[in-house]
From Swiss-Prot:
Keywords carried by this UniProt record: mRNA processing, mRNA splicing, Nucleus, Spliceosome
SMART domains: DIM1 (SM01410)
GO biological process, one term: mRNA splicing, via spliceosome
Residue span of region Disordered: 132-160
Protein name, as recorded: Thioredoxin-like protein 4A homolog
Ranges of Basic residues composition bias in the record: 133-160
Assembly description: Component of the precatalytic spliceosome (spliceosome B complex). Component of the U5 snRNP complex. Component of the U4/U6-U5 tri-snRNP complex.
Cellular location(s): Nucleus
An annotated GO cellular component: U5 snRNP
Similarity comment: Belongs to the DIM1 family.
Record lineage: Eukaryota, Amoebozoa, Evosea, Eumycetozoa, Dictyostelia
Signal peptide from the UniProt entry: none
């Protein structure tokens, strides 16, 4: 099975090959599969999407370090394309994305970069935990500012 997959990678010349490794019964993989299935038609000119059960390709498990629940990897002309998502692991996406547009944007970035000969592309969005923390912190500050503004407006209304 692993050899067949490698052959398929080498036959695709003009599109990115997106492979979701994992188990079909895994809830994380099910989420990722739903996202991938829903965008397949939109990205058909840029990418072809495969789902691979890691129990079927044990030789690839060690080669690509497929130890996570739901890794997704990108290949172009039989070459692994890495994506800097801000998480420290550029080899693969280790979680199920919940936003269709995020996956479309990542595939488009991989496609454009790979066509230019790049082996590593930067994700259009930062998925680092630090960024998520800062974003939440900013939201809290914004809520406080909004409450202050509302109080000022209410005071102005009372005074008028």
């Amino acid at each position: 099975m692993g050899g067949l997959l490698i052959k398929q990678l080498s036959t695709e010349e003009d599109r990115v090959v997106v492979i979701r490794f994992g188990h079909d019964y895994n809830p994380e993989c099910m989420k990722q599969d739903d996202i991938l299935a829903s965008i397949a038609e939109k990205v058909k000119n840029m990418a072809v999407i495969y789902v691979v059960d890691i129990t079927e390709v044990p030789d690839l498990n060690s080669m690509y370090e497929l130890y996570d629940d739901c890794p997704t990897m990108f290949f172009y002309r039989n070459k692994h394309i890495m994506v800097d998502l801000g998480t420290g692991n550029n080899n693969k996406i280790n979680w199920a994305l919940t936003n269709k547009q995020d996956m479309i944007d990542i595939i488009e970035t991989v496609y454009k970069g790979a066509r230019k000969g790049k082996g590593l592309v930067n994700s259009p969005r930062d998925f680092s935990p630090q960024y998520k923390f800062l974003k939440k912190k900013k939201k809290k500050k914004n809520k406080k500012k909004q409450k202050k503004k509302i109080k000022k407006i209410k005071k102005k209304i009372k005074n008028n």
